């Protein structure tokens, strides 16, 4: 699939997704999914988090991995990965895996950032989930929000979008509610994963072990570097697209920090 075709499809999907969320309560993120040759699969998850005084990120990653692994379609296998300050700020993606990082990425307007890399066929080939400690006061004010953001950013790397975008509670971490019930997946999230992964593909991206190096421009991304072209914005999030230099695309979804929400659209 050519990049321009993917970009056009993404913009179209963004419009369709907004309608779909309201009308059908489906919340798959366009058609994004990992390619697999089996009905269910294991997704290796690299832990590049460290605990701080505001949030115990390694513990929250463990909780999120356990919750998401209740799905009949995927199982998260978490392993430790380099977690120096520099490495976490770069949070370079690793092919065939998702990487989870926390760092002080700066007062750039985002609380969490989920990024997926689509290969030339439009399948997810790697992903990252970042939590921004520059807004650590958010975690202090509402400890549940740290678990909420961790769970949601990881969910995006599977191809899930939001259950609601108006701040109402769906008792799911895939909403934007501050409810203490919105810290983990619910039945609808698991059902949506069954729908997304109801078919198999001719190859697997979660099994890949090598690929061209992640572009330096993306590896150095700390929030101040442009995320690409803004293709969609809502009250609580924004979506950006950037070419990856090898025939695919990076799709970046930004969870806006308090005070940066779009009140008027």
Label the model's feature ranges:
Residues 45-57, 134-145, 176-183:
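Second-shell loop/turn segments in exported
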Residues 140-204:
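The catalytic-center signature of Zn2+-dependent metalloproteases
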Residues 2-54, 222-265:
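Disordered inhibitory propeptide/activation segment of secreted metzincin zinc metalloprotease zymogens
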Residues 11, 36-38, 93, 124, ...:
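Short, solvent-exposed coil/turn segments
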Residues 55, 200-235:
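Ser/Thr/Gly/Pro-rich low-complexity, disordered linker/stalk segments of secreted
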Residues 13, 64, 197-200:
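Alpha-helix boundary/capping residues
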């Amino acid at each position: 699939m050519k990049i321009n075709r993917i970009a056009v499809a993404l913009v179209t999907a963004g419009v369709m997704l907004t309608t779909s969320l309201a009308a059908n309560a489906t919340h798959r993120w366009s058609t994004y999914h990992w390619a697999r040759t089996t009905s269910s699969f294991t997704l290796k998850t690299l832990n590049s988090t460290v605990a701080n005084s505001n949030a115990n990120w390694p513990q929250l990653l463990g909780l999120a991995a356990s919750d998401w692994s209740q799905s009949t379609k995927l199982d998260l296998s978490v392993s430790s990965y380099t977690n120096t300050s520099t490495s976490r700020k770069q949070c370079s993606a690793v092919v065939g895996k998702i990487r989870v990082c926390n760092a002080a990425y700066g007062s750039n307007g985002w609380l969490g950032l989920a990024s997926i890399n689509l290969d030339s066929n439009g399948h997810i080939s790697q992903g990252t989930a970042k939590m921004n400690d520059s807004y650590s006061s958010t975690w202090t004010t509402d400890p549940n929000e740290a678990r909420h953001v961790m769970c949601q950013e990881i969910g995006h790397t599977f191809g899930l979008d939001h259950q609601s975008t108006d701040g109402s509670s769906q008792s799911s971490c895939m909403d934007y509610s501050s409810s203490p019930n919105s810290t983990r997946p619910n039945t609808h999230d698991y059902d949506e994963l069954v729908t997304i992964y109801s078919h198999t593909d001719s190859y697997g991206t979660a099994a890949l072990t090598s690929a061209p190096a992640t572009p330096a421009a993306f590896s150095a991304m700390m929030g101040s570097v442009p995320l690409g072209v803004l293709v969609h914005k809502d009250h609580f999030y924004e979506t950006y697209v950037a070419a990856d230099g090898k025939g695919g695309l990076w799709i970046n979804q930004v969870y806006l920090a308090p005070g940066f929400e779009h009140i008027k659209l």
